[in-house]
């Protein structure tokens, strides 16, 4: 697994002929988010775009995989845009440069996964939480298995792909050994994580 700093031409040549997957953490803001957090998220996606351009010296992106996307076309991108408006912009740019959008999700798993995830947010009793978490965990594992299968079957030899997925999901994926994984972690990523930790600490202090 490669942490992106800066890959120069000799290093890029060492990845020639290998399957490559450029992984970007899906980070988004919400309508009522504080201005400083929204600014951090915007800076994050700007930096991601610049780092991807540098990284593509190791291989131009030919396949694009993104969470939420269940089918090709503008409709799926519009749905994704309601959650994270910066991701469709990045995807469209890569499609214009010759990439192909590959549906990553299955309605059989994404729907139940979302429902059980929402249920976990409103459960109060330990007994019910354990039951709901069991259902959630079961469908979450099936969803991740499907995601891994889609990438394995659609990323061809010597191709480079872009994966946009929450970090907590990505770390659970066991990619085949012949896929070289690159993690895109611009400076603003750490700033966002720090912002979220401080926010949580302040909330806990109030509680």
Identify the role of each PLM range.
Residues 1-207:
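Compositional signal for N-terminal targeting/processing segments
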């Amino acid at each position: 697994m490669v942490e992106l700093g800066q890959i120069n031409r000799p290093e890029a040549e060492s990845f020639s002929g290998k399957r490559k997957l450029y992984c970007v953490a899906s980070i988004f803001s919400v309508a009522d988010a504080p201005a400083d957090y929204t600014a951090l998220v915007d800076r994050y996606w700007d930096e991601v775009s610049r780092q991807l351009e540098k990284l593509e010296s190791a291989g131009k992106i030919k396949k694009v995989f993104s969470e939420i996307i269940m089918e090709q076309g503008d409709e799926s991108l519009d749905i994704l845009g309601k959650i994270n408006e910066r991701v469709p912009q990045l995807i469209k740019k890569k499609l214009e440069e010759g990439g192909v959008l590959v549906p990553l999700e299955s309605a059989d798993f994404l729907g139940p996964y979302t429902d059980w995830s929402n249920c976990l947010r409103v459960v109060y009793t330990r007994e019910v939480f354990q039951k709901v978490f069991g259902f959630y965990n079961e469908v979450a594992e099936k969803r991740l298995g499907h995601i891994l299968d889609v990438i394995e079957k659609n990323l061809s030899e010597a191709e480079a792909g872009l994966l946009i997925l929450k970090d907590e999901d990505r770390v659970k994926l066991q990619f085949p050994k012949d896929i070289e994984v690159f993690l895109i972690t611009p400076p603003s990523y750490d700033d966002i994580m720090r912002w979220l930790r401080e926010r949580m600490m302040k909330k806990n202090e109030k509680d």
